[in-house]
Every structure is written in C-alpha cells, then in structure tokens.
C-alpha cells in the first residue's frame, strides 16, 4: 500500500510540561484545529479527549501518554498535508517514567510553560530527559491571558535555569486581559485570531505602532540566529542586513534539529490563541523521521547495527507502552523505526527470544480508534494480542534480528503492603497486579516471605494510590493498603580481606563439602554487585564457581542488619578446598552464602536511605516557615530562586522517610498556597539513630 503521506511530512512529537501549565488543554486545541475534535474538550469539566482514564478526568491530571494521530495543512492552508503523531506526556513527577519512555520514541517535542509560573521544577526534569535522548524541541508559553503573565521573563528563565537557547518566532501583543494576539517575527505581521470561530479563522494585520521598535529588535535576534547556520547566510546578512523568509525558516529548522536553538512561541490555549501558529512551527522546524540519525541497535552477536526510517528496510520497532483496554484487551504501543508491520505478521522479540503474532493494528485518536492493515516506517500505532512483550522491548523481522537500545527504568523508592478485602479477590488481585506491573516497569510486586503479605513498590505515594485505584476500577478488586514503607538498602563501608565459609556434613554415606575464602569490599554508589573469580590452581573446581556466585546472590535480597537488599558490593573468590566425593554445587552455594554473611558483619555494614530532591513553590511570606519545616525533616536546603509571577522556589534534599504526609503539612503551613514536587535523587547512609530505629522495628 502506497503511503498517503510521504515520510518527510511525518512529525512524531511529544507535548510535555509541568503540571498545570495547561498541556492537556493545549493538546485538545491541537486536536480541535486539526479537525479531529469538533467540540473542544475542557479539562475544567473533566471531558478532555486525551485524558481517557477515569482517574485522570477526576483528578484533572494526565497520567498515561495516549498517542494520537492528527493532520495539519497550516493555519492558512499553505502546507501540503502533514501527519502529526502526538504523544501526551504526564507532568506529575511520580510519572516521570511515562515521560522518559515517550521521549525515547519521539523525534521532536513541544515544551509547554505557564506564562505566570515559568520554568517550574518538573520542567527541569523533563528538559533533562529530552537532553538525554537528544530530542529537538520548541517552547510554547501558555496562559498569556492570566494575571502576572510575562513572556520575556520566561524567556530569561529558559536561558538561565535550563541553559536553553530560546529564539522567539513570535512575541505577544499585550498580556493578561489585554493579550490579543502575536506578532509573527518571520513575516513581521500581527496575527489576530477570530474569537467567534474559536480561533479557526485569523487575519494578518499591521504591527501596532507602540510595538514596532520591540518587534524590530526581536526580529533582528531571529535573523541573526538564522544567519549563524552557515557562513554563506552570515555573509549575505552582513552585506544586505536581512534574509528572505524561506532562508530564515530553513536555517531555523536546521539549527533546531541540530539542538542548537529552541524556537519559542506563545498564546493562550484556553482562549484559542497561539496554538495554531505553534502547530505551523512544528511543521516548519521539528524533524521528520528521516531528518534524524538512524536508530542504533545490536545484532545477535552483539555487533552494532543501524536501521534507517525506510519501508524497504527490514522491520524493527520498539514497544514503548502497554495498556489494558476494556474493549480489546492488552494494547501495545509501538514506534516502527524501519520496514513495515502488517496485521497477521509473525515477528521476533530478541529480549525474550520468542516469536509473536501480530493481531489487529489500531491507530489511536485519544480514546477513539481506527483499525488499519499496516504501519509504515516512522509511524506509531497500537497492536492487539501480543502475548509476552514488556515496555522497552524490541520487535523485529524473524530473519534479521536486532535489539534496539533498552530503556532505563528507575528503582522504586516506596512500598506498601496490599491485602484483598475478601477471599474472592485474592486470585483477581494477583492477576491485576501482574498486568499493572507489565504495563509500568517502575511498579514492582513481590511477596514478603516472612509475613506472606503482597508488597507493591513504586515511585511515590500518588503513583501507588493511582495503581490501587486502577485495580478497583479496571479489575474490580477491593484492597486494603498498609502504611507506606521506605525502600531502605544495606551496604558495607570497609573491606574484609579474608572471610571463610565452610559447609560440611559428613556422617556416613554421601556427605556435603564446600569450602570457600572470599574478599568482600564496597563499591561506589550505583555499583550494584560484582563477583570476581580469582581461583588459581583449581583449589575450587571450575564447575562449582557459579554455585558460589549464586549462593551470594541469593543472600543479597535480605541483608544482615534489617533484611533489606544489599547493594554496591564486590566479592572476590580467591581460595577454598573441595572433597572428591562429598563436594557438590549445593555445598558450595551454602559455603558462599555463609562466607558472604560473615564478611558483611566484619565490613562495617550500614543502612542506606533514599534521599529525595524536593522543590517547593511558595508565596514569599511563607518561605521562612517552609525552610524551617524542611530542616526539621532532616532536610538540607540547597537554594532558593525567584518565580516569574512572584514567590519563591525552595530546593532541598530530604530523606523520603521524613516526607510522608508532607502534602497535608505544607497545605496547613501555607494556607494551601504552596505546591511541591519530589523525585528520587540517590541513596545515602542513614544517621545512626535513624538506622537503630529501623533495625529495631524490623526485629520485632
């Protein structure tokens, strides 16, 4: 089947922002102007098209990134039809994983900022993730109609806080309730949208006289940014003092795709102004799948290979999101990097080493769906009926294996026990939890051997709350939830040069004999676990060495202090002995485990606790109280910044154990006027009094 839209007219973009910057409303307007939605869905009344889970509509926040396809010909109908796949990403910090996994499959992003709030804490997290995956992006300053809106202050913050290089393509006409439109610096015309048509019609007008000087100054900056793209353009600019419209657009496009600059636009999505011009900028400046480098992967032998965005290449795709759908069951969202995927095809999952048959293929429009026969290179779609595919895995051609880069997922920092309310719910709960864990790699489920309880772990209180809520709504499972528990870790501080483990049972008949000598030493934070085989002269036979490693690894999940997982240790096996008849794998496994436990005791074991990066936005009057409160929670205040619309941002590092119930506390401290975000930073050694309490509580 020939392409309806050539690949150079595809745009895979993410819309990403801090909570409350108006991202979902912006996406709604995009869907409206691209002719998909005929009545605009408002977040205010819980009817936004992109936010399709019940909890999202109730809470007014976006949790899952729905992928939607839309078409655009330019606000003046001046482009050939372009196909835009939009991935809506959540702005709440507990859902950073969603942002991370969508960044992996995007070609470009539109970052939405609030004209009053400016660059907020989550904006910085999202910006870092976009840097990590090298995503070209543009900035849209929303809510220009709000009191305190200031486009130029946000411009400064993008430069200072994010170290971005913003280049305004438009500047606002007025602000707050006098915001009437924008000045297009490329055309040097004012754009005024027609309110009666909800902004679908507009007209170009002359620049208001009082803004002429400002417009010329910003136009100069735009043309300079364009001229810097090549020596040829720079020479022309120096000779003539100006550049053609087509030259400016081509140069800004080139520099945006290279990540050197970030085009900046503004408007108010709620009042139907500015999103239309931003959509034009998506087409003019953001890359198509063929404007970015081919995707890297490895073949079965570990050699590096590349896949180009071309239908004639062998098929490869990345599964970037799983969702349970009430009508069709499990949906797997895939980004096709090369080749073509047809329904009925059999493909290969190299991570699991299994074949998968492709059932129906759906193109999603928020919560509507259209069945299609095939997905071409560069496109995004949802596949029904995959049996065993997890987020971040590759699907590829059966005869041309490739593993695309794995995504990295963070370790959970908070745990809770869950119990079904009735016997009947027991089995259903197991099924529900495993389905949810498959969809969300930052959510883990395990069974506590001692208490027999089911423990769920995630990225924050809200994260777990929403998953328990989904269990009830989607699977009909009622559960009681225990108090949140901190995910502590254990490690060592000193090196134990020699520790012995001997497992001997010899009382007639076939006995057991395993004897090892280990060196146990600490690794740098994040080092995990390392096992070194330094046996010389066969004192421990080759075939038993993996058993020693296995014995140690089986000890790692429960440390000697309080039974928490052990991290950042290196173990070297350098001596031991064996018995011709009585030695076996099990004996060496036991010996390894015994020696390691003893080694930990001798190597100054310590308890590690998760430290969180906490950022609080508060009116200035309450800043002192907020800082005092954070200090009383063993927090280290690391700095304070000014917000665009007044107020302060306080940055601190606080142990997670001290942050439970913080939302309620902050509300009463600031009369509900402050907000905060929190994300995991690193593990750090818990003070002795804290460690003693935790160990005593676990020992009960």
From Swiss-Prot:
<dbReference type="GO" id="GO:0005737">
    <property type="term" value="C:cytoplasm"/>
</dbReference>
<dbReference type="InterPro" id="IPR004161">
    <property type="entry name" value="EFTu-like_2"/>
</dbReference>
<keyword id="KW-0251">Elongation factor</keyword>
<dbReference type="InterPro" id="IPR035647">
    <property type="entry name" value="EFG_III/V"/>
</dbReference>
<dbReference type="Pfam" id="PF00679">
    <property type="entry name" value="EFG_C"/>
</dbReference>
<dbReference type="GO" id="GO:0032790">
    <property type="term" value="P:ribosome disassembly"/>
</dbReference>
<feature type="binding site">
    <location>
        <begin position="88"/>
        <end position="92"/>
    </location>
    <ligand>
        <name>GTP</name>
    </ligand>
</feature>
<keyword id="KW-0963">Cytoplasm</keyword>
<dbReference type="GO" id="GO:0003746">
    <property type="term" value="F:translation elongation factor activity"/>
</dbReference>
<dbReference type="InterPro" id="IPR009000">
    <property type="entry name" value="Transl_B-barrel_sf"/>
</dbReference>
<dbReference type="InterPro" id="IPR031157">
    <property type="entry name" value="G_TR_CS"/>
</dbReference>
<feature type="binding site">
    <location>
        <begin position="17"/>
        <end position="24"/>
    </location>
    <ligand>
        <name>GTP</name>
    </ligand>
</feature>
<dbReference type="InterPro" id="IPR047872">
    <property type="entry name" value="EFG_IV"/>
</dbReference>
<dbReference type="InterPro" id="IPR004540">
    <property type="entry name" value="Transl_elong_EFG/EF2"/>
</dbReference>
<feature type="binding site">
    <location>
        <begin position="142"/>
        <end position="145"/>
    </location>
    <ligand>
        <name>GTP</name>
    </ligand>
</feature>
<keyword id="KW-0648">Protein biosynthesis</keyword>
<dbReference type="InterPro" id="IPR041095">
    <property type="entry name" value="EFG_II"/>
</dbReference>
<feature type="domain" description="tr-type G">
    <location>
        <begin position="8"/>
        <end position="290"/>
    </location>
</feature>
<dbReference type="Pfam" id="PF14492">
    <property type="entry name" value="EFG_III"/>
</dbReference>
<dbReference type="InterPro" id="IPR000795">
    <property type="entry name" value="T_Tr_GTP-bd_dom"/>
</dbReference>
<keyword id="KW-0547">Nucleotide-binding</keyword>
<protein>
    <recommendedName>
        <fullName>Elongation factor G 1</fullName>
    </recommendedName>
</protein>
<dbReference type="Pfam" id="PF03764">
    <property type="entry name" value="EFG_IV"/>
</dbReference>
<dbReference type="Pfam" id="PF03144">
    <property type="entry name" value="GTP_EFTU_D2"/>
</dbReference>
<dbReference type="InterPro" id="IPR020568">
    <property type="entry name" value="Ribosomal_Su5_D2-typ_SF"/>
</dbReference>
<dbReference type="InterPro" id="IPR005225">
    <property type="entry name" value="Small_GTP-bd"/>
</dbReference>
<dbReference type="InterPro" id="IPR005517">
    <property type="entry name" value="Transl_elong_EFG/EF2_IV"/>
</dbReference>
<comment type="function">
    <text>Catalyzes the GTP-dependent ribosomal translocation step during translation elongation. During this step, the ribosome changes from the pre-translocational (PRE) to the post-translocational (POST) state as the newly formed A-site-bound peptidyl-tRNA and P-site-bound deacylated tRNA move to the P and E sites, respectively. Catalyzes the coordinated movement of the two tRNA molecules, the mRNA and conformational changes in the ribosome.</text>
</comment>
<dbReference type="InterPro" id="IPR014721">
    <property type="entry name" value="Ribsml_uS5_D2-typ_fold_subgr"/>
</dbReference>
<dbReference type="InterPro" id="IPR027417">
    <property type="entry name" value="P-loop_NTPase"/>
</dbReference>
<dbReference type="GO" id="GO:0003924">
    <property type="term" value="F:GTPase activity"/>
</dbReference>
<dbReference type="InterPro" id="IPR009022">
    <property type="entry name" value="EFG_III"/>
</dbReference>
<dbReference type="Pfam" id="PF00009">
    <property type="entry name" value="GTP_EFTU"/>
</dbReference>
<comment type="similarity">
    <text>Belongs to the TRAFAC class translation factor GTPase superfamily. Classic translation factor GTPase family. EF-G/EF-2 subfamily.</text>
</comment>
<keyword id="KW-0342">GTP-binding</keyword>
<dbReference type="InterPro" id="IPR000640">
    <property type="entry name" value="EFG_V-like"/>
</dbReference>
<dbReference type="InterPro" id="IPR035649">
    <property type="entry name" value="EFG_V"/>
</dbReference>
<dbReference type="GO" id="GO:0005525">
    <property type="term" value="F:GTP binding"/>
</dbReference>
<dbReference type="GO" id="GO:0097216">
    <property type="term" value="F:guanosine tetraphosphate binding"/>
</dbReference>
């Amino acid at each position: 089947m020939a392409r309806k839209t050539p690949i150079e007219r595809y745009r895979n973009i993410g819309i990403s922002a801090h909570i409350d910057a108006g991202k979902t409303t912006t996406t709604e307007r995009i869907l409206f102007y691209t002719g998909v939605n005929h009545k605009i869905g408002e977040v205010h009344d819980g009817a936004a098209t992109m936010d399709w889970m019940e909890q999202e509509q109730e809470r007014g926040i976006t949790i899952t990134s729905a992928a939607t396809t839309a078409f655009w010909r330019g606000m003046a109908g001046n482009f050939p039809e372009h196909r835009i796949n939009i991935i809506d990403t959540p702005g709440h910090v507990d859902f950073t994983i969603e942002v991370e996994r969508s960044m992996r499959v995007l070609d470009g992003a539109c970052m939405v900022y609030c004209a009053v709030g400016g660059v907020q804490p989550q904006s910085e997290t999202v910006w870092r993730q976009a840097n990590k995956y090298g995503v070209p992006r543009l900035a849209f300053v929303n809510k220009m109609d709000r009191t305190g809106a200031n486009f130029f202050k946000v411009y400064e913050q993008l430069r200072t806080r994010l170290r971005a290089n913003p280049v305004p393509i438009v500047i606002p006409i007025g602000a707050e309730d006098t915001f009437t439109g924008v000045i297009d610096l490329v055309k040097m015309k004012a754009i005024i949208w027609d309110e009666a048509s909800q902004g679908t019609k507009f007209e170009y007008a002359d620049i208001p006289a009082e803004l002429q000087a400002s417009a010329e100054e910003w136009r100069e900056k735009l043309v300079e940014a364009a001229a810097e793209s090549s020596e040829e353009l720079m020479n022309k600019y120096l000779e003539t003092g100006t550049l053609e419209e087509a030259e400016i657009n081509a140069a800004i496009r080139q520099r945006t795709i290279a990540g050197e600059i970030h085009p900046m636009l503004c408007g108010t999505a709620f009042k139907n102004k500015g999103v239309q011009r931003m959509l034009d900028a998506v087409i003019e400046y953001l890359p198509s799948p063929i404007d970015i480098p081919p995707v890297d992967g490895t073949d079965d032998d570990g050699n590096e290979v590349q896949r180009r965005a071309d239908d004639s290449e062998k098929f490869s795709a990345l599964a970037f999101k799983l969702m349970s759908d009430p009508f069709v069951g499990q949906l797997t969202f895939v980004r096709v990097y090369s080749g073509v995927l047809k329904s009925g095809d059999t493909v290969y999952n190299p991570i699991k080493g299994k074949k998968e048959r492709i059932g129906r293929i759906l193109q999603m429009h928020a919560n509507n769906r259209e069945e299609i026969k095939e997905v071409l290179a560069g496109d995004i779609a949802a596949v029904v009926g995959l049996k065993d595919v997890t987020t971040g895995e590759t699907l590829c051609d059966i005869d041309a294996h490739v593993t695309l880069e794995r995504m990295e997922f963070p370790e959970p920092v908070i745990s809770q026990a869950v119990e079904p309310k009735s016997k009947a719910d027991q089995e259903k709960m197991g099924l529900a939890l495993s389905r949810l864990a498959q969809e969300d790699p930052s959510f883990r489920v395990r069974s506590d051997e001692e208490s027999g309880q089911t423990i769920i772990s995630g990225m924050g209180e809200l994260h777990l709350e929403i998953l328990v809520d989904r269990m009830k709504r989607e699977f009909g499972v009622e559960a009681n939830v225990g108090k949140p528990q901190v995910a502590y870790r254990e490690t060592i501080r000193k090196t134990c040069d020699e520790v012995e483990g001997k497992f001997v049972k010899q009382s007639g008949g076939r006995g057991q004999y395993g004897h090892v000598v280990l060196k146990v030493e600490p690794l740098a934070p994040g080092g995990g676990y390392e096992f070194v085989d330094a046996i010389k002269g066969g004192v421990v036979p080759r075939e038993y060495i993996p058993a020693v490693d296995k014995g140690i690894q089986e000890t790692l999940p429960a440390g000697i202090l309080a039974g928490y997982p052990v991290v950042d240790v290196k173990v070297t096996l350098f001596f031991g002995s064996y018995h011709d008849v009585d030695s076996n794998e099990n004996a060496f496994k036991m010996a390894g485990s015994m020696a390691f436990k003893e080694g930990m005791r001798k190597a100054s074991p310590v308890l590690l606790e998760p430290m969180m990066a906490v950022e609080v936005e508060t009116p200035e009057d309450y800043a002192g109280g907020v800082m005092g409160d954070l200090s009383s929670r063993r927090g280290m205040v690391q700095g304070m910044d000014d917000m665009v619309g007044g107020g302060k941002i306080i940055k601190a590092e606080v142990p997670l154990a001290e942050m439970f119930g913080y939302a309620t506390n902050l509300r009463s401290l600031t009369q509900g006027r402050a907000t905060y975000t929190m994300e995991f930073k690193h593990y750090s050694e818990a003070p002795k009094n804290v460690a003693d309490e935790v160990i005593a509580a676990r020992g009960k």
